[in-house]
From Swiss-Prot:
<dbReference type="InterPro" id="IPR036291">
    <property type="entry name" value="NAD(P)-bd_dom_sf"/>
</dbReference>
<feature type="binding site">
    <location>
        <begin position="5"/>
        <end position="34"/>
    </location>
    <ligand>
        <name>NADP(+)</name>
    </ligand>
</feature>
<dbReference type="InterPro" id="IPR050812">
    <property type="entry name" value="Preph/Arog_dehydrog"/>
</dbReference>
<feature type="domain" description="Prephenate/arogenate dehydrogenase">
    <location>
        <begin position="5"/>
        <end position="285"/>
    </location>
</feature>
<dbReference type="GO" id="GO:0070403">
    <property type="term" value="F:NAD+ binding"/>
</dbReference>
<dbReference type="GO" id="GO:0008977">
    <property type="term" value="F:prephenate dehydrogenase (NAD+) activity"/>
</dbReference>
<keyword id="KW-0560">Oxidoreductase</keyword>
<dbReference type="GO" id="GO:0005829">
    <property type="term" value="C:cytosol"/>
</dbReference>
<dbReference type="GO" id="GO:0050661">
    <property type="term" value="F:NADP binding"/>
</dbReference>
<comment type="pathway">
    <text>Amino-acid biosynthesis; L-tyrosine biosynthesis; (4-hydroxyphenyl)pyruvate from prephenate (NADP(+) route): step 1/1.</text>
</comment>
<dbReference type="GO" id="GO:0006571">
    <property type="term" value="P:tyrosine biosynthetic process"/>
</dbReference>
<dbReference type="InterPro" id="IPR006115">
    <property type="entry name" value="6PGDH_NADP-bd"/>
</dbReference>
<protein>
    <recommendedName>
        <fullName>Probable prephenate dehydrogenase [NADP(+)]</fullName>
        <ecNumber>1.3.1.13</ecNumber>
    </recommendedName>
</protein>
<dbReference type="GO" id="GO:0004665">
    <property type="term" value="F:prephenate dehydrogenase (NADP+) activity"/>
</dbReference>
<keyword id="KW-0963">Cytoplasm</keyword>
<keyword id="KW-0827">Tyrosine biosynthesis</keyword>
<dbReference type="InterPro" id="IPR008927">
    <property type="entry name" value="6-PGluconate_DH-like_C_sf"/>
</dbReference>
Amino acid sequence: MKETFQVGIIGFGDMGRLYAEYISKAGWRVNVCDRPENYESIQATYGNGGYTVLKDGFQVSRTSDYILYSVEAEHIDKVVALYGPATKVGAIVGGQTSCKAPEMNAFEKYLPEDVDIISCHSMHGPKVNPKSQPLVIIRHRASDEHFEIVNEILSCFKSSVVYLSAKEHDRITADTQAVTHAAFLTMGLAWHANNQYPWEINRWCGGIENIKMNLSMRIYSSKWHVYAGLAILNPEAQRQIQQYASSVTELFKLAISGKAKEYEDRIRNAGKFVFGENMDRNSSGLLLSDELLDQYSISNIPKDESKRNSHLSILAIVDSWSKLGIHPQNHMICSTPLFRLWVGVSEYVFRHPGLLDSCIYTATKHNDFSPDDLEFVVAVRSWSECVAAKDFTTYKKRFLETQEYFRPRFEEATRVGNAMISKLLENLQKM
């Protein structure tokens, strides 16, 4: 079958290239294209990459037996409207967008009725090895034969396959990604607004701070549209980002109004809801320790010079999970590396009473960190308002400005972050 069956990929961005490389190396014939104006440059760079570079989506659609749309969620409707009607008779079509509602709507509107629909979503970025990472496969409408073929094609990633409906995918994706991304995007925006490089300041060095910095830089070194599409086009994601902004704001107001007891009760009750009454059990499966986290630092400041931190970003995410009735550990089977790390970090704070006590004390009794927390409040509310207004233009502008501010440290942060993620997930897999 591999000699005659052709896989087509429309959209040759980072994930499109990842799919083309893995599928072609597995022996399948692969056709790829990007925007027509990019044809010559892609042909010159990747023409000998083991797959065929075609001029546009019409050629890919007419010749391929399984066509994957690897385009931004914001543009999926107009791209499928353009190329969908040209789909080969009896072919299979799918997409890789992180939000499936607009993708499925486009497929149902523009694809011929004789075309089967089987979508997928690799729950990781292009810089992560797909082996053992969650891969969602969505059988929207398909024969058993076509379903088996798609499973065989995607088996080349050696990922952990999860079968979901499009609706289930969007709900779980919101649960596992929306607030996680919002937290790290907000950190970067707040640091930028304060004109701070956190690795140069003793407020942010050692242990948990390394995860915050590395993962925030990791997100800002990626493509803006990856995060914008998931946040703006997924209704569940919008609701969760709004709740996170509310949790951040309400906790900050309690902290600065002298309501320390109310603040502490709210935090501890949220922790009990999310992680259970018995905090001795490690539900995330991540074996975190200060010694391990200290190995992955991009800061030159000695740990013993670090200062207390309120960890508002972490306490607020647990509070928002509690308010939304979310138990994050229930979604570990189809979660991203970022989400697993963030759940692990959050649980680490709550499972170490001394650390949690320090966070509460710093927020309510120690005003030195209040200006930084205020900047975080302003940043998270600005992201939330942008998402609620479905404002892609402002989202892109804020993201790219912050990205440019931190660009000099991306290479080092990516290298250190990759090593950190690999080590921590290795510990997870050993359990």
